A protein has these predicted regions:
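Active-site-proximal helix/loop microenvironment
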Residues: 52-59, 63-70, 168-172
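Active-site-surrounding "flap" and adjacent substrate/cofactor-binding loops of secreted or lumenal enzymes
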Residues: 19, 68-100
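N-terminal low-complexity, Pro/Thr/Ser-rich intrinsically disordered segments
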Residues: 5-33
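Non-catalytic, conformational "gating/processing" segments within enzyme and secreted inhibitor domains
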Residues: 49, 91-172
């Protein structure tokens, strides 16, 4: 594979604890917005004759986490695509995580992270780190996006999936 060099990514959330956050009660309007997003996602992604495994929930989480760092026109466009404001989306997705993790014989373990290039110009605000920790339990990492980062991402995924997914990328 293209992953051969060993190096450590910088964990920007080191020392940040997951705090208390408001989980939505999963209202009809929030569910309708999420279903609308999922339908549009599939309509714009799936090609005839193609087999695809795609999780709208995972895509919503990824876009929700990145929306927490967006401002201005980027944030407005993201919220328009998602069908709700970022604060509502954060609460909605936390509500689903809570609901899916409760009781029964079902076991659900979600793992989220954001990876930034080491040469990222924007400053990462503590509020971005804290919000993503509170609502998504997400780690935020800074890395050079080279072969070493490939190895770090695969190690992160392997750890979070208890080895069920040993490798997710071959190269960056």
């Amino acid at each position: 594979t293209g992953c051969t060099v060993t190096a450590q990514a910088i964990d920007l959330t080191e020392g940040i604890q997951r705090g208390t956050a408001y989980a939505s009660s999963l209202t009809d309007s929030e569910n309708a917005a999420a279903v609308d997003f999922a339908v549009r996602l599939f309509q714009n992604t799936v090609q005839d004759g193609e087999t695809l495994l795609l999780s709208p929930f995972s895509v919503l989480c990824a876009l929700g986490m990145t929306a927490n760092g967006a401002q201005g026109e980027t944030l407005s466009q993201t919220e328009a695509v998602l069908g709700m404001k970022k604060e509502a989306l954060n609460s909605y997705l936390l509500g689903w995580q809570t609901h899916l993790s409760q009781g029964g014989q079902t076991q659900l373990h979600l793992a989220n992270s954001v990876w930034l290039t080491a040469d990222s110009r924007p400053t990462v605000n503590k509020s971005f780190l804290q919000t993503n920790a509170d609502y998504y339990g997400a780690g935020i990492y800074k890395a050079p996006f080279n072969d070493a980062t490939c190895k770090s991402i695969n190690a992160w995924v392997r750890e979070k999936t208890d080895g069920l997914i040993p490798q997710i990328i071959d190269a960056i």
